[in-house]
């Protein structure tokens, strides 16, 4: 096999790999916008999802409160949806929005 044939083969394999990887990670994005996340994290939580397709119903995979989670998109909440969030622990003081590992400040009012 000549060097030009080998080069064509390698480029072809690279293109096929890129197209296949894009198809796997792509998928159909669900409607709505992810909520704003103003929390600074000391450590990221393990992801609960990787794409919108990992989430049930209308929920989207969004980075929120230190990790990727399935959440109801902002547009859906404005239309009367339910946050359906578990809130444990007090909300941080205004101006300090850091989340330490193991704590949860979801559902706290935004400024």
From Swiss-Prot:
A GO molecular function held by the record: serine-type endopeptidase inhibitor activity
Signal peptide feature range: 1-23
Coiled coil: none
InterPro entries for the chain: Elafin-like_sf, WAP_dom
Span list, region Disordered: 80-111
S-S pairs: 34-62, 41-66, 49-61, 55-70
Residue ranges occupied by any WAP domain in the UniProt entry: 27-74
Annotated Polar residues bias: 101-111
Primary subcellular site in the record, as a coarse category: secreted
GO CC field: extracellular space
Subcellular location as annotated: Secreted
Any one Gene Ontology BP term: innate immune response
One Pfam family from the record: WAP
SUPFAM superfamilies, A to Z: Elafin-like
Name of protein: WAP four-disulfide core domain protein 12
Natural source organism: Macaca mulatta
């Amino acid at each position: 096999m000549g060097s030009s044939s080998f080069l064509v083969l390698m480029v072809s394999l690279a293109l096929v790999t890129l197209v296949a990887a894009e198809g796997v990670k792509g998928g159909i994005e669900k409607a709505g916008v992810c909520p704003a996340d103003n929390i600074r994290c000391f450590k990221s939580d393990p992801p609960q999802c990787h794409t919108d397709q990992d989430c049930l119903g209308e929920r989207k995979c969004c980075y929120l409160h230190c990790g990727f989670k399935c959440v109801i998109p902002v547009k859906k909440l404005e239309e009367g949806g339910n946050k359906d969030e578990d809130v444990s622990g007090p909300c941080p003081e205004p101006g300090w929005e850091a989340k330490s590992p193991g704590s949860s400040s979801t559902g706290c009012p935004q400024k």
